[in-house]
């Protein structure tokens, strides 16, 4: 088999066989196929697309290119949630204990964040003592006993994806549905998920700017999952403005605690219930989404979800007293209100740029080596569709330095006020097949 023949075949719009796809993935991973041939095939896929079968084969070839995590020692159906990213996305912190309170096993592998704010692990490390350095046996024991644990991404999972991802980044082939879908799904499957719930974001702060693109990506991933024996559902949700009010690590932990009590921001509360319902149904702990939702609301009300969060923190060395006393979380030295310059209705909050503003305060990383300041960030005081008076705070900056002029300028550039505006729809579509 020659790589050049595979490239020409795809260039001509023909379907590649399972063997051809495996030949490419294995050869590219072990270095016998050079970058220039891999980038030629990526470009051919970009223009000629792939069938559902090819996408499933590409996904599984990437899964099998490295180690996989075997979670079969964990009882029950392991459901994993993946978000395509966004700003102020605190859903994992709320969802993990929430669904675990209904005996859905949450065996979560999470990464650190690059960009606007930290990843889930950075957020959890805002809690004194919390660590993710668990052995595999400890991890499995905790999930079997308490239904929830988080471990750092480890091992050599999907090396083919890591290599191909870096190549796509520099060859203009990032925006290809088959390549994005197989990349995301290969990571989830290699990490041992039996079933997968996807939160595909759309809008200004999202990778997929239009609802059509988001729906196409969501359907592609759901079909891959179902074709390789992993039941998959997706939610298309809005990221034209940040989710919730908090952007920053300790601030988001506090917001997660409020949400577990049923007192969180409306949009975060709604998204968590929507995603959580799908997780509960896939884990076979409820027959319908409505039944699942009612059960989730019940464990929020009766305090079981909050207790589960405390157990989870304690199990991993964290100070669980922060749940009752969030002032023990890292605190910023300065709180600076940014007032509205005019009256009206908030018409736009550019999510990714507000994320960058939080990063300028120190809430995120520009490079892997950067240190994150867990205390700093931004609290939105208004959301799109809210009325605002002149002089009323639009946001509050939590900072550890007094001079934040460039952050204030960024806030003014990216929060717009108009005569009228409607709140955007949060949940666009549910995709189940």
Swiss-Prot record:
Q: Name one GO cellular component term.
A: cytosol
Q: What switches on its expression? A: Induced by deoxyadenosine and thymidine. Repressed by DeoR and glucose.
Q: State where phosphate binds.
A: 81-83, 92, 108-110, 120
Under the heading PANTHER family, the entry gives: THYMIDINE PHOSPHORYLASE (PTHR10515:SF0)
The UniProt entry, under NCBIfam families, shows: PRK05820.1 (NF004490), PRK06078.1 (NF004747), Y_phosphoryl (TIGR02644)
Family according to the record: Belongs to the thymidine/pyrimidine-nucleoside phosphorylase family.
Q: Which protein, by its recorded name, is this?
A: Pyrimidine-nucleoside phosphorylase
Q: Which organism is it from?
A: Bacillus subtilis (strain 168)
């Amino acid at each position: 088999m020659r790589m050049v023949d595979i490239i020409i075949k795809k260039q001509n719009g023909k379907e590649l066989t399972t063997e051809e796809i495996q030949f490419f993935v294995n050869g590219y991973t072990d270095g016998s196929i050079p970058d220039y041939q891999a980038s030629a095939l990526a470009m051919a896929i970009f223009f000629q697309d792939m069938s559902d079968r090819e996408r499933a084969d590409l996904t599984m070839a990437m899964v099998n290119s490295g180690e996989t995590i075997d979670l079969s020692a964990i009882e029950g159906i392991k459901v994993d949630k993946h978000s395509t990213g966004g700003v102020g996305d605190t859903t994992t912190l709320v969802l993990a204990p929430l669904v675990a309170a209904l005996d859905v096993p949450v065996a979560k592998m999470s990464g650190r964040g690059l960009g606007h704010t930290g990843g889930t692990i950075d957020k959890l490390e805002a809690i004194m003592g919390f660590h993710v350095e668990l052995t595999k046996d400890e991890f499995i024991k905790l999930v079997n006993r308490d239904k929830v644990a988080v471990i750092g991404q480890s091992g050599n999972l999907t090396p083919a994806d890591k290599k191909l991802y870096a190549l796509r980044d520099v060859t203009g082939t990032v925006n290809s549905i088959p390549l994005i879908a197989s990349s995301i799904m290969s990571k989830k499957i290699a990490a041992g998920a039996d079933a997968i719930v996807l939160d595909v974001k759309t809008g200004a702060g999202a990778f997929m700017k239009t609802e059509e693109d988001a729906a196409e990506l969501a359907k592609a991933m759901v079909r891959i999952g179902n074709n390789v024996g992993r039941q998959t559902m997706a939610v298309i949700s809005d990221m034209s403005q940040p989710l919730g009010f908090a952007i920053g690590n300790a601030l988001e932990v506090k917001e997660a605690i409020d949400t577990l009590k049923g007192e969180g921001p409306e949009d975060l509360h709604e998204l968590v219930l929507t995603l959580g319902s799908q997780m509960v149904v896939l884990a076979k702990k409820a027959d319908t989404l409505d039944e699942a939702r009612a059960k989730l609301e019940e464990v929020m009300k009766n305090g079981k979800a909050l207790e589960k969060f405390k157990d989870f923190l304690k199990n991993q060395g964290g100070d669980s007293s922060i749940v009752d006393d969030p002032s023990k979380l890292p605190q910023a030295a300065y709180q600076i209100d940014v007032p509205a310059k005019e009256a009206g209705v908030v018409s736009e909050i550019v999510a990714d740029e507000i994320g960058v503003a939080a990063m300028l305060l120190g809430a995120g990383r520009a490079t892997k080596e950067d240190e994150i300041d867990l205390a700093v960030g931004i609290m939105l005081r208004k959301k799109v569709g809210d009325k605002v008076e002149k002089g009323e705070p639009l946001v509050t900056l939590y900072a550890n330095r007094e001079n934040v002029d460039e952050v204030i300028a960024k806030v003014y550039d990216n929060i717009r006020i108009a005569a009228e505006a409607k709140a955007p729809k949060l949940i666009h579509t549910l995709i189940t097949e």
